[in-house]
Amino acid sequence: MPAFDHFAAIAPIYARVSYSKRDVMREVASLPVRGKLLDVGGGTGRVASAIRDLVDEAIIADVSLGMLKEAPLSALKPVCGGSESLPFADGSFERVIMVDALHHVIDHAHSAREMFRVLKPGGVLVIEEPDIRTFGVKLIALAEKLLLMRSHFLAPDEIMKLFLNGEKKVKAEDGTAWVVIKKQVTPQA
């Protein structure tokens, strides 16, 4: 029996929730940038839509077809696929973001490798997550467990350890943490 898709059930509501952290994302992702952005676990496209004007092209990848059906197709390109096996070539994107989704994936390490793989050298990857070090987020984590959402929250330092390479930094405020990874440009021999 397939698992219940919590996200398809809430997609129509979620699509109406605006993204309030555009300015922080602009800062940590070094936007605007020429090129393509991939929003992994992007659901209805609410985050990608909020920053769409800062990139040439925005693609959202999500496993929930119900969420993707709510995405504004005129501005975003939806792709049904999981973070553990992204259907893109190596180095396809100048920016890769994952907002409020890492705690929902099954294999954090594999998802991190995949996101880093599709990031171009010199590109920036941003993972925005509720900061499990805060009391309010601990309550959210408990609620998601009770709702059988299989969530597993990681602290920012644990997220950084998923990435073996790249320049890493963390910004945290108001119960949210942004883990930023910049992929190094390999010098040509």
Where are these regions (language model features)?
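A short glycine-rich, Lys/Arg-flanked "PGG" loop and its adjoining helix->strand segment in the class I
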Residues: 109-121
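A conserved beta-strand element that flanks and buttresses the S-adenosyl-L-methionine
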Residues: 97
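Conserved class I S-adenosyl-L-methionine
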Residues: 1-32, 46-47, 67, 140-143
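Class I SAM-dependent methyltransferase SAM/SAH-binding core
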Residues: 38-85
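Short catalytic micro-motifs in class I SAM-dependent methyltransferases
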Residues: 100-101
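C-terminal alpha-helical "lid/dimerization" subdomain adjacent to the S-adenosyl-L-methionine
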Residues: 11-18, 47, 126-179
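C-terminal lobe and adjacent flexible extensions of AdoMet/dcAdoMet transferase-like proteins
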Residues: 180-189
